[in-house]
């Protein structure tokens, strides 16, 4: 039973029978104030229903455009639009920061643009004069790289399906240790060499230790949300720099195209590994490990909060034009049907919405390959700023379109295909068409 505050400050108690009242057989309406009799209630109900029917006869489809027939496009649609824009900003800012860190490092630190080795996953070299042989080697490197990614993803899904959580945690902790300690040590050393900054080894070791220890605590246990997000962006940038340095040029572009296709298949196919991982997590009502996912809101993991399952409930109210006509909430705003959730114990009612907001989640692999594309554009070929900025804008446009599709389909979608496709198209078109045109134009001026 819900109580709505009318505009004339009269309180009416509406139950299920009164909310489903029809014009053909109006049910008597009970009112608790003012001594109003049943006859007055019937006449009031009939007047409201007739008025709504007359409005419906004028234009029966006037509210269909909002997506829900018979529902006015009011504040709820505006609220949805605001949250959509907020979610775009929540993901655009960290993606932008990650790409800025990578591009700034590529433009200033020569270590990450020097080719003095390759990954074990790309054994075929591209130092051949033959274009066909170079293309073949890049395709073979791509096949090996994608095969390794597929095998490791399936292995992770199998471990998660059989609840091997300790093994997964150990795997992720070892990866985080390598990124936060070893790769950070290498990165900091090269930055200090580039800018000719002297630092003794004890200070360097202490700095790396503090950085890595705090990162391990924030990522795998507890910590402020913004600090956790900053560490996830940092490890994504470090991993992207490793790929930029050790991936051959042609192999990098072919891998970017192939990984976007694989991401499409892995997420959208019924038996795709990433889709199975997401569906398994949803069935168990468990969050995916924070070390794999960037979240714009706090991700609750096992041990961070003890919630009472019996306290979580929802009440779905049916849509009733009569209630909507002069039903107002306690703040005087029009009240629309929605899902009311019981407050969790220990949280104030006014903070419930903020605490329950899950935010938007983006895989760290998407951060890495976005940054690889922009970093390769800045490091290889002409390396001019026009090409780099074109790839940067293309990735953000693709991310916005992906979020738009996410709002439409309301299910997990791959974040790489649109952004990587736009990035590759913008890179090759800018590098081969726009840049020569601008050089010629500047020469003749």
From Swiss-Prot:
Lumenal side: 109-138, 188-200, 245-249, 383-388
Protein name, entry field: Presenilin-2
Keywords: Endoplasmic reticulum, Golgi apparatus, Hydrolase, Membrane, Notch signaling pathway, Parkinsonism, Phosphoprotein, Protease, Transmembrane, Transmembrane helix
Family to which the UniProt record says this protein belongs: Belongs to the peptidase A22A family.
UniProt note: domains: The PAL motif is required for normal active site conformation.
Subunit-level organization: Homodimer. Component of the gamma-secretase complex, a complex composed of a presenilin homodimer (PSEN1 or PSEN2), nicastrin (NCSTN), APH1 (APH1A or APH1B) and PEN2. Such minimal complex is sufficient for secretase activity, although other components may exist. Interacts with DOCK3. Interacts with HERPUD1, FLNA and FLNB.
PTM characteristics: Phosphorylated on serine residues.
Domain of life: Eukaryota
A GO CC annotation given for this chain: Golgi membrane
Active site: 263, 366
Segments on the Cytoplasmic face: 1-87, 160-166, 222-223, 272-361, 410-413, 435-445
UniProt cross-references to InterPro entries, sorted A to Z: Pept_A22A_PS2, Peptidase_A22A, Preselin/SPP, Presenilin_C
EC number assigned by the record: 3.4.23.-
Residues forming coiled coils: none
Membrane topology: Multi-pass membrane protein
Main function: Probable catalytic subunit of the gamma-secretase complex, an endoprotease complex that catalyzes the intramembrane cleavage of integral membrane proteins such as Notch receptors and APP (amyloid-beta precursor protein). Requires the other members of the gamma-secretase complex to have a protease activity. May play a role in intracellular signaling and gene expression or in linking chromatin to the nuclear membrane. May function in the cytoplasmic partitioning of proteins.
Region (Disordered): 1-76
Biased composition (Polar residues): 19-30
GO molecular function: aspartic endopeptidase activity, intramembrane cleaving
Membrane-spanning parts: 88-108, 139-159, 167-187, 201-221, 224-244, 250-271, 362-382, 389-409
Residue ranges annotated as intramembrane: 414-434
Top enzyme category: hydrolase
Motif PAL: where in chain: 414-416
Residue positions where Phosphoserine is found in the record: 22, 25, 30, 52
